[in-house]
Amino acid sequence: MTKIAVLGGGSWGTALANVAAENNNDVRLWTRTATQADEINSQHTNQKYLPDAKLSSELMATSNMALAVMDAEIVLTVVPTKVVREVARQLADVLNKQDHQVILAHATKGLEQVTYKRVSEMLAEEVPAKYRSTLAMISGPSHAEDVIKHDLTSVSIASENEEAAKLLQQVFANSSFRPYTNHDLLGSELAAALKNIIAIGSGALIGLGYGANAQAALLTRGLSEMRALGQAMGAQPETFLGLAGIGDLIVTGMSPNSRNYRAGKQLGEGKSLQEIQDDMGMVIEGVSTTKAVYEFSQHHHVEMPITAGIYRILYENEPLRDVISDLMSRPLRSED
């Protein structure tokens, strides 16, 4: 039995905590509010984020981070990108009061605004130095709504520390949840963030009434952009052809369970971004990631026309059909 603290009681944090608890691990889920923790402990539900799902009775929740992290061998943060530093600073305060080593992992798919930093970089800057050597990420095609129903799911666990990746693999693996390990943390984090941008575009095409041909073309050329930026930043190109790359892109860019896809679809149907964000009530990571990646690509001269087009839609209020027209009329070129 492994002691695991999961920080973040949203849909994905809850689903991952539930997988680990069902695998007979000692799991404590940290939530923002005592009300949410009480619901999970007494009713074994998390209705706000996973309506009608029944959670393991072995999963314990608390709004006290110190209690959640106490004696944990693994600490997994699963919070929106915009609050990673805030949560990491709270975690650092807790870790500073204990002296045993922990594996620090995350399952957040985004980049920090302005700095363009990946989640592992933010965590490394905030937590004590001795915890940085085990940083890892869980990513891949894994909607929480499917995981909680025990639909067959495979994920990627990326870490430069092979021992940490293998322990995470062991505690989460079961008959419906199969983790693979890889050592390209940089590429996995970039792929996880970048595919959210392309998913918004994919949903927008469907919302406008376009069909599978258009969607497949956008996903394929979007993958090319993801890979180009990844290589420019030092990632391994093959990572983008694995679960963390094309796997996550397919499910995020085509599934109605994807917030980014749904946001794009509603944009295509004529809703404003503000209306969509108000209605959804949950973070749409691709919106902020689009801005960060667009600015980064401009600064480093990486050509990303689809990302630039989605930026114009989200931040410059350019009509979707005008952006599509521009993309389709770009100078002809080879596919390479």
From Swiss-Prot:
Residues annotated to bind sn-glycerol 3-phosphate: K109, G140, S142, K195, D248, S258, R259, N260
The answer to whether keyword NADP applies is yes
Q: What are the record keywords, sorted? A: Cytoplasm, Lipid biosynthesis, Lipid metabolism, NAD, NADP, Nucleotide-binding, Oxidoreductase, Phospholipid biosynthesis, Phospholipid metabolism
**What is a GO molecular function of this protein?**
glycerol-3-phosphate dehydrogenase [NAD(P)+] activity
EC number(s) from the headed UniProt entry: 1.1.1.94
Q: Which residues form the active site?
A: K195 (proton acceptor)
Which biological pathway?
A: Membrane lipid metabolism; glycerophospholipid metabolism
Instruction: State where NADPH binds.
Output: S11, W12, R32, K109, A144, R259, V283, E285
InterPro entries annotated for this entry?
Answer: 6-PGluconate_DH-like_C_sf, 6PGD_dom2, G3P_DH_NAD-dep, G3P_DH_NAD-dep_C, G3P_DH_NAD-dep_N, NAD(P)-bd_dom_sf
What is one cellular component GO term in this UniProt entry?
Answer: cytosol
Which GO biological process entries does UniProt record here? carbohydrate metabolic process; glycerol-3-phosphate biosynthetic process; glycerol-3-phosphate catabolic process; glycerophospholipid metabolic process; phospholipid biosynthetic process
Q: Which reaction does it catalyse?
A: sn-glycerol 3-phosphate + NAD(+) = dihydroxyacetone phosphate + NADH + H(+); sn-glycerol 3-phosphate + NADP(+) = dihydroxyacetone phosphate + NADPH + H(+)
List the Gene3D superfamilies: N-(1-d-carboxylethyl)-l-norvaline Dehydrogenase, domain 2, NAD(P)-binding Rossmann-like Domain
The superkingdom of the source organism is: Bacteria
**Which compartments does it reside in?**
Cytoplasm
The UniProt family comment states: Belongs to the NAD-dependent glycerol-3-phosphate dehydrogenase family.
Q: What does this protein do?
A: Catalyzes the reduction of the glycolytic intermediate dihydroxyacetone phosphate (DHAP) to sn-glycerol 3-phosphate (G3P), the key precursor for phospholipid synthesis.
Q: What PANTHER family does the annotation carry?
A: GLYCEROL-3-PHOSPHATE DEHYDROGENASE (PTHR11728), GLYCEROL-3-PHOSPHATE DEHYDROGENASE [NAD(+)] 2, CHLOROPLASTIC (PTHR11728:SF1)
What name has this protein been given in UniProt? Answer: Glycerol-3-phosphate dehydrogenase [NAD(P)+]
Organism field:
Leuconostoc mesenteroides subsp. mesenteroides (strain ATCC 8293 / DSM 20343 / BCRC 11652 / CCM 1803 / JCM 6124 / NCDO 523 / NBRC 100496 / NCIMB 8023 / NCTC 12954 / NRRL B-1118 / 37Y)
Q: Which gene encodes it?
A: gpsA
